[in-house]
Amino acid sequence: AETPLKAEISETPGFRSIVAGAETVAAPGRDYTAKAILRGLEPGRAYYYRFIAPDGSISPIGQTRTLPEGGIDKYRMAVFSCSNMPFGWFNAYAHAAQVGDFDIALHLGDYIYEYQRGDYPSAKDTVAGRLIEPANEIVSLADYRLRYASYRADPDLQAIHARAPMLCMWDDHEFANDAYADGAQNHQANEGDWQTRKAAAEKAYREWM
């Protein structure tokens, strides 16, 4: 079932004054993800945000920052790429979230990887406790959705998203290794139609990112 949510924006973490708000819905057609567009915010300002469910439950508080306007003296970005979870812990996310001396996080792609467990990295190179879901190579919409959910369960990835806005672009592994218009190195004929797989990957990306 759909769940209506209320998004609130404040200049303080205590939310004593709400400066903007919006209504949104977490729906099964979007894998129960939700996004809200907030208007009327000041440029170059830090804000706090939260979501409130119909029963009064409140989400963890996140921080964001609007883009500046006009000339600026300094703008700092925390840059990430190629985050293959089974290879190790997301210490870079954790460090950036803890230090927090940047305006925006920028992810240059390969936010997730499509491989099955034990493929890349190999089973012997997989760090203990870093098991991805699903275990198989992701091909279907349900597969891609679960892989994003698996990554987002990581507390360090949650921390960086809660600490600052993240601007993301996809590379190839959000679809399959060495993807191109009509196929990919890591897409075989027995995995179905490439265009169907590509559309599923893009839908999951736009839901979760």
Predicted regions and their residues:
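Metal-dependent phosphoester/phosphodiester hydrolase catalytic core
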Residues: A1-M209
